[in-house]
């Protein structure tokens, strides 16, 4: 027994004792580190993680490292270094680390969001981008799909005139239906129990990811029961059952003559691979139902909560800045009026609205810290050595709140994104990467930007979004998780009088 214990302790020491680095190499400055636990005891325990890592830059600089268990992580907090990691050396840092909770979420690194660099990730990312290309023109045009759901949302909100409501559920339904149409050409009804189940699953997953889970740091702890891991497994099982039911129905009716959604793209790729009618990168084994399910789950997971959260952040900031809201509505009235639906081309005339959206994405980035990257080869950042297998995290919060790049970064100032005349959009700083960049950038960036503009222009065209009668303004402190969520709040819905008059006039003419 004592021999076994000794072997066990020696094994732990080998795994977790800091390794000797190449003597000639120059590495990022590191937080203090202890055997077994690494830097865990030296990391701030209170407050929001992204803000804590930003504050550590005051002592350690814009690039520093720390150890958690046996893993070394490098934190990046400056746009030049971030762009080197994401763009200049994007392929070298295109890996993803194995993390216990995310392995469950991604079915052991399937899909695209959490998949490691390799043939599977490259194939599925390419197929997802091909699917988005389906929605550029015609009846499947993305703008048309978004406007359909925006109209349904607005029609529902019109029934809530004079009421103070939480926008979460109606917004989530609208955005879920857009994602569902892209994946399956399928939409949910408001009373559909599957819709509520999907929302509950997403909430459960984000709740788990918002917690610090020791198993993610010390994989050896998997031998012990974990309530968080069990909850994650339950959420993923429910999610997979719901999506698999839809997937199987779509497979029954699939024909290669009509490719109209993401699932069709994935199924056609599998047919081609099975028939040896595909390139060497399309291995049929990488296109199993489990692989397809993981990719579709990624699109749902990334596409719904992110957009819903950003729209709620925009509404919250407008409630805090009513004069800005009025100016945006004035520009909508002057440039669009009430007799047509806003279009993407209206960005050119609704520059204040677009600047407001961009400022919200800056001051409250939906992912304050990008999903960790991993060095797939020995590399460098600046003049510092980065060993193969090192995790690299870009602190987007630090980039977006750098005082040297942004004047008074904690103030909400949409004018940052406008020229001095207020008539042209500008890019005021390279320290702005709301959707990431490079090989691992957000595949749904175009979709998200269109959703944000079309939903907000439609809402402000039809409604006055007001502070509830109790005078309670939304908190601007977020709930950190994989997504920076706003705390629940209510907004009073009032149909605009000018909209009512325009509709009445149109019905009598």
Swiss-Prot record:
<dbReference type="GO" id="GO:0020037">
    <property type="term" value="F:heme binding"/>
</dbReference>
<dbReference type="InterPro" id="IPR001128">
    <property type="entry name" value="Cyt_P450"/>
</dbReference>
<keyword id="KW-0560">Oxidoreductase</keyword>
<dbReference type="GO" id="GO:0005789">
    <property type="term" value="C:endoplasmic reticulum membrane"/>
</dbReference>
<feature type="binding site" description="axial binding residue">
    <location>
        <position position="442"/>
    </location>
    <ligand>
        <name>heme</name>
    </ligand>
</feature>
<keyword id="KW-0479">Metal-binding</keyword>
<keyword id="KW-0472">Membrane</keyword>
<dbReference type="GO" id="GO:0008202">
    <property type="term" value="P:steroid metabolic process"/>
</dbReference>
<keyword id="KW-0755">Steroidogenesis</keyword>
<keyword id="KW-0456">Lyase</keyword>
<keyword id="KW-0492">Microsome</keyword>
<comment type="function">
    <text>A cytochrome P450 monooxygenase involved in corticoid and androgen biosynthesis. Catalyzes 17-alpha hydroxylation of C21 steroids, which is common for both pathways. A second oxidative step, required only for androgen synthesis, involves an acyl-carbon cleavage. The 17-alpha hydroxy intermediates, as part of adrenal glucocorticoids biosynthesis pathway, are precursors of cortisol.</text>
</comment>
<comment type="pathway">
    <text>Steroid hormone biosynthesis.</text>
</comment>
<keyword id="KW-0443">Lipid metabolism</keyword>
<dbReference type="GO" id="GO:0042446">
    <property type="term" value="P:hormone biosynthetic process"/>
</dbReference>
<dbReference type="GO" id="GO:0016829">
    <property type="term" value="F:lyase activity"/>
</dbReference>
<dbReference type="GO" id="GO:0042448">
    <property type="term" value="P:progesterone metabolic process"/>
</dbReference>
<dbReference type="GO" id="GO:0005506">
    <property type="term" value="F:iron ion binding"/>
</dbReference>
<keyword id="KW-0349">Heme</keyword>
<dbReference type="InterPro" id="IPR036396">
    <property type="entry name" value="Cyt_P450_sf"/>
</dbReference>
<dbReference type="GO" id="GO:0006704">
    <property type="term" value="P:glucocorticoid biosynthetic process"/>
</dbReference>
<dbReference type="Pfam" id="PF00067">
    <property type="entry name" value="p450"/>
</dbReference>
<keyword id="KW-0503">Monooxygenase</keyword>
<dbReference type="InterPro" id="IPR002401">
    <property type="entry name" value="Cyt_P450_E_grp-I"/>
</dbReference>
<dbReference type="GO" id="GO:0004508">
    <property type="term" value="F:steroid 17-alpha-monooxygenase activity"/>
</dbReference>
<keyword id="KW-0408">Iron</keyword>
<comment type="similarity">
    <text>Belongs to the cytochrome P450 family.</text>
</comment>
<protein>
    <recommendedName>
        <fullName>Steroid 17-alpha-hydroxylase/17,20 lyase</fullName>
        <ecNumber>1.14.14.19</ecNumber>
        <ecNumber>1.14.14.32</ecNumber>
    </recommendedName>
</protein>
<comment type="pathway">
    <text>Steroid biosynthesis; glucocorticoid biosynthesis.</text>
</comment>
<dbReference type="InterPro" id="IPR017972">
    <property type="entry name" value="Cyt_P450_CS"/>
</dbReference>
<feature type="binding site">
    <location>
        <position position="202"/>
    </location>
    <ligand>
        <name>substrate</name>
    </ligand>
</feature>
<keyword id="KW-0256">Endoplasmic reticulum</keyword>
